């Protein structure tokens, strides 16, 4: 269920303050954050935010089409290493029927 319009989007105060300070000084630094639930606002465009995925910080460059999404959407928390090799990779499966 989406957030109420009455409340407005959630953006962590510390993160928003750091981005606005960098905009006023025209700086481009990587900003580390653990706030995966923060919504991306238009002020963030052009900055790189390092979002924590539970193990490391994943650098995410913010572009215009990311506005309105949450930071956590761009830093996956799970790694997929593929299914077990088994017989399928070795070619040991039964021949196809016609």
UniProtKB/Swiss-Prot annotation:
InterPro entries: Ribosomal_uS19, Ribosomal_uS19_bac-type, Ribosomal_uS19_CS, Ribosomal_uS19_SF. Keywords: Ribonucleoprotein, Ribosomal protein, RNA-binding, rRNA-binding. Transmembrane segments: none annotated. It holds the Pfam family Ribosomal_S19. Residues 77-98 are annotated as: Disordered. GO terms for biological process: ribosomal small subunit assembly; translation. One of its GO terms (cellular component) is cytoplasm. The keyword Ribonucleoprotein applies. One of its GO terms (molecular function) is structural constituent of ribosome. Belongs to the universal ribosomal protein uS19 family. Protein S19 forms a complex with S13 that binds strongly to the 16S ribosomal RNA. This is Small ribosomal subunit protein uS19. The gene is rpsS.
């Amino acid at each position: 269920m989406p957030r109420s319009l009455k409340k407005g989007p959630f953006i962590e105060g510390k993160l928003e303050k750091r981005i606005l300070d960098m905009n006023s000084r025209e700086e481009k630094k990587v900003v580390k954050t653990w706030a995966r639930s923060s919504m991306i606002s238009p002020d963030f465009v052009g900055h790189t935010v390092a979002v924590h995925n539970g193990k490391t910080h994943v650098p995410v460059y913010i572009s215009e089409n990311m506005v309105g999404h949450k930071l956590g959407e761009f830093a996956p928390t799970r790694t997929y290493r593929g299914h077990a090799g088994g017989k399928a990779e070795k070619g040991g499966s039964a021949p196809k029927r016609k």
